[in-house]
C-alpha cells in the first residue's frame, strides 16, 4: 500500500496491490468477486449511468486505499464514456477543500494555490478492459499514470496497439482526459468554497486572467468606467453598495476563427446579502456560492482550451457583490440596460437576473447565436425540483433535447420548465419602465425569472438557461459528496459542447 499523503493516482492496468477493492462494471450491473453490488435490471439508460456515478462517488468519499476497475465491454465508445464517468465520480467523491491552504492568503492565491486548495485524498485507481487477461496482455507493457498536479501535465496518452486490445487502448487514452476534466471540476468547486474575503471581485478577475494567459484565450475585464460607457447599468446597479468595482469578464476561445460561436454566461455574485431587501441570517448562509455559475463555466473554458476542443466559445462573466451601502440601489429605481430596455428594481434581492440581462446582451453583441447561461437564480426552482435537479429553460425544442440528453448521459439531472407568455405578463406591470425585475406576491418565481431573461434574447438566438440553486451546493456532507460547491452541470455542458 502506498504511503498516505502521496495524492490521488489514476492509471491504466490491473492493480498489483493484493488488498485492493476489485469492481467489475458489466452490462447488467456492478459486481465484486463474490456478488452483484448494483443491478441494472429494469433501469433506463439514464438510471444506469446515475447508478454507476453514485456508486463510484461513494468509493471516492473514502479517499484511501486502491480500487481495481474492470470494464466488461467491447464497445470503444462505451469504454471511453465509462472511463470518464467513473474517474469523474471517484474524484467528485474524493474532493475536499483544504483548510490549511488558506493560511497567509495573498493576492493571486486563488490561482497560485488551487492545487493545494483542491484535495483529492490518497485513493489509487486502476482501470482496464475485461478482455485484457484473456488476451494475455501484461499490464506492465502499458501503464499510464495521471497524478493530480496541473492540467497541463496531463497530455494524450501514447498507446501501443501491438500490446493492447482495442478497448484497452481507448481506456488508456481516455484516462488523461478524464483526470483533466475531474481536476477542473475540483478547481470550480474550490472557487465556490472560497469565502468573499478571500475570493472577491478583484481575485476572481485575476483568476480568469491567469487561465486566459495560460491557454492563449483572449481576455478583457470591463470595469466601472467602461461599463458606464457601454451602458451596462444593470450590473453597475447591483454592485452600487460595494466598495469594489464591478467587472464584466469576457474570455474568447477561438480555435476556428470565423466559425460560429457559443456563449457561456455564468452568474458571478461574489456575495449576495440581498441589498436593501436584506437576507435573514439563515438565507444569507452560503451566499459565497452565488458565483458558482461563473466558476463552473469558467472552468469549462479551461477544460476546452486544455483539451483542444475545436469549437469557438465566448465566456461572459458578470462579477459583482450585492451589499448595503450609502449608494446601494433602492426599491423603485429605474435603470437602462445594455439592450436599451428600462427596468424597475422592485426587489433588490432579485439581482441575478439584473447582472445576467446585461451579460446576455453582451454575449449576443459578440456574435454568438447560441447562449447557455448557468445561474444560482431562484429558490422557486429549488423548492420545485429539490437538491439534485437543475431547472432547464430553453427557447428551442431541438436544442433542449440535446441538453437533456447530454445531462442524462453524464449522470446529471435536469427538468424542463415552462417558458410561456403567461410568465412574461408578470414582469410587464411597471408603469414607469419596460420591465420589472420581480412579480410581487406571484407564484412561479423560477419561470418568471426565466421570462425576464428571455426578454433580452434576440430573435434567431438559441438560448438555454439552467437554474441551479438546488444542485449547485451540497448543503451537508453525505455519502456521495462533501459539503460545499458541487461543480453542477459541468459534465453535461461539456458533453454537449463536445458533440459535432
Give each language-model segment a name.
Residues 2-261, 265-268:
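Short amphipathic alpha-helical segment within the helicase RecA-like ATPase core
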Residues 8-34, 66, 137, 151, ...:
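A generic structural signal for tightly packed, nonpolar segments enriched in small/aliphatic residues
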Amino acid at each position: 500500500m502506498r504511503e498516505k499523503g502521496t495524492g490521488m493516482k489514476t492509471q491504466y492496468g490491473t492493480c498489483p496491490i493484493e488488498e485492493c477493492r476489485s469492481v467489475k462494471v458489466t452490462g447488467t450491473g456492478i459486481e465484486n468477486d463474490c456478488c452483484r453490488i448494483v443491478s441494472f435490471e429494469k433501469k433506463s439508460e439514464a438510471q444506469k449511468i446515475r447508478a454507476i456515478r453514485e456508486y463510484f462517488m461513494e468509493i471516492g468519499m473514502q479517499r484511501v486505499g486502491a480500487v481495481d476497475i474492470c470494464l466488461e465491454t467491447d464497445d470503444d465508445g462505451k469504454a471511453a464514456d465509462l472511463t470518464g464517468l467513473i474517474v469523474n465520480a471517484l474524484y467528485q467523491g474524493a474532493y475536499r477543500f483544504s483548510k490549511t491552504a488558506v493560511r497567509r492568503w495573498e493576492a493571486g492565491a486563488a490561482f497560485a494555490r488551487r492545487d493545494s486548495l483542491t484535495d483529492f485524498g490518497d485513493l489509487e485507481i486502476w482501470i482496464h478492459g475485461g478482455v485484457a487477461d484473456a488476451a494475455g496482455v501484461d499490464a506492465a507493457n502499458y501503464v499510464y499514470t495521471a497524478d493530480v498536479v496541473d492540467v497541463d501535465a496531463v497530455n494524450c496518452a501514447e498507446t501501443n496497439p501491438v500490446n493492447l486490445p482495442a478497448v484497452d487502448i481507448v481506456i488508456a487514452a481516455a484516462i488523461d482526459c478524464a483526470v483533466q476534466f475531474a481536476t477542473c471540476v475540483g478547481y470550480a468547486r474550490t472557487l465556490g468554497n472560497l469565502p468573499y474575503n478571500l475570493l472577491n471581485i478583484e481575485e476572481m478577475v485575476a483568476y480568469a486572467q491567469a487561465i486566459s494567459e495560460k491557454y492563449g484565450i483572449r481576455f478583457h475585464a470591463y470595469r466601472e468606467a467602461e461599463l458606464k460607457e457601454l451602458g451596462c447599468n444593470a450590473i453597475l446597479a447591483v454592485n452600487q453598495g460595494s466598495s469594489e468595482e464591478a467587472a464584466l469578464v469576457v474570455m474568447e476561445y477561438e480555435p476556428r476563427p470565423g466559425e460560429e460561436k457559443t456563449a457561456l454566461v455564468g452568474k458571478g455574485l461574489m456575495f449576495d446579502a440581498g441589498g436593501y431587501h436584506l437576507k435573514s441570517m439563515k438565507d444569507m448562509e452560503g451566499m459565497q456560492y452565488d458565483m458558482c455559475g461563473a466558476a463552473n463555466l469558467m472552468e469549462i473554458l479551461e477544460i476546452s482550451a486544455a483539451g483542444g476542443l475545436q469549437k469557438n466559445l465566448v465566456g461572459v462573466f458578470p462579477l459583482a457583490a450585492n451589499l448595503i451601502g450609502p449608494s446601494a440601489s433602492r426599491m423603485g429605481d429605474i435603470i437602462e440596460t445594455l439592450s436599451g430596455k428600462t427596468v424597475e428594481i422592485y426587489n433588490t434581492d432579485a439581482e441575478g437576473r439584473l447582472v445576467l440581462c446585461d451579460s446576455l446582451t453582451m454575449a449576443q453583441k459578440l456574435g454568438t447565436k447560441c447562449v447557455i447561461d448557468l445561474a444560482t437564480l431562484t429558490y422557486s426552482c429549488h423548492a420545485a425540483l429539490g437538491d439534485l435537479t437543475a431547472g432547464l429553460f430553453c427557447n428551442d425544442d431541438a436544442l433542449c433535447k440535446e441538453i437533456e440528453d447530454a445531462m442524462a448521459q453524464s449522470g446529471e439531472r435536469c427538468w424542463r420548465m415552462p417558458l410561456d407568455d403567461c410568465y412574461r405578463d408578470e414582469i410587464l406591470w411597471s408603469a414607469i419602465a419596460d420591465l420589472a425585475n420581480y412579480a410581487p406576491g406571484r407564484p412561479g418565481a423560477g419561470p418568471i425569472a426565466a421570462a425576464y431573461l428571455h426578454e433580452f434574447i434576440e430573435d434567431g438566438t438559441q438560448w438555454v438557461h439552467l437554474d441551479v440553486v438546488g444542485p449547485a451546493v451540497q448543503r451537508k456532507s453525505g455519502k456521495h459528496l462533501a459539503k460545499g460547491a458541487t461543480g453542477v452541470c459541468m459534465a453535461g455542458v461539456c458533453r454537449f459542447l463536445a458533440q459535432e
